[in-house]
Amino acid sequence: MMHKPLFAAALALLPLAAQAQTAALPTDPAADWSVATSEHRIAVEGGKVWVRVNGVIGQGETPVILIHGGPGGTHLGFGTLLSLADQRPVILYDQLDSGMSDHPGDPANWKPARFVAELEAIRKALGVERWHVIGHSWGSALALEYAAAYPEHTASAVLSGTFLSTSHWITGTNLLIRDLPDDVAATIRACEGPTPPAIEVCEPATAAFYDAYNGRPDRPAPTSVMLAYRQRYGGKGFNPELYNTMWGPTEFRASGSLAGYDVSGLLARVDGAKVMFVIGQYDEARIDTVQDFLALTPGAELAVVPGGSHAFIAERPEVAEAIFRDWMNRKDAAAPGH
């Protein structure tokens, strides 16, 4: 799932299920995409969400909306993907109770179905007929739920850093812990036990797990533009109460409302040719788990970002943007009437 907001994006390509050709980089890589064409506050169940658009709806190629992780994260992790707006409108938003959106703080709103309905409310308010939905981590589950519920409005669905099943995720996490050095793995297990050691003992072991699988230490440092953007548009930032209520206090076990969550069965209900899975080479979303999901989705594709973890969008920004750009261009070209 997600712990720290990620600001940048990533691109490195190692397709497994199908060949994906690397697309050209943006025509103007120096452009300041941090300036939105328009900003909106859109009414949804429970309050209003903040939405920004780069580009003009109805102009260019099919729009794309980017769905952040968490639960409780923000749009900041998609910063460099705004360069996709040289071809199509790019829509970013903060889910209710996160970032720049309203924070009613009502747990009654913290249900997957409401988050999916939130997406549809945004689509209607912006006047979008069809769009690509790219969801990362928790956002990938929302992207799949949306694509299954609204196929007529979904040009494609990208399930990035794929999370579709809590039980699969926890199983994968336990296997990843086993791959850490023995002393680190033993400390994490002790910290998750009935009588955990002091926090000073647990924090370094948890950090070692995150460095390996959730945000590798060699990722690029945020630029001054990114830091300025975060200061201006970070809002209230990550919402730990929302995360803890839906997931739990640690990455290693789910004790919240998502404990029994599993939407992998929806893969059989969507058009596999419109689905792509994307993960990092060292992703917390393990490749064998995602290959199982791929097998349930005939016609879907899988791309792996070399050197990337769950935060591959921040770690390999140039490779990730090309993956998403090429995918959407190919799906647009294959669409009837294009």
Segments (PLM) and residue ranges:
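Conserved hydrolase catalytic core segment
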Residues: 129-175
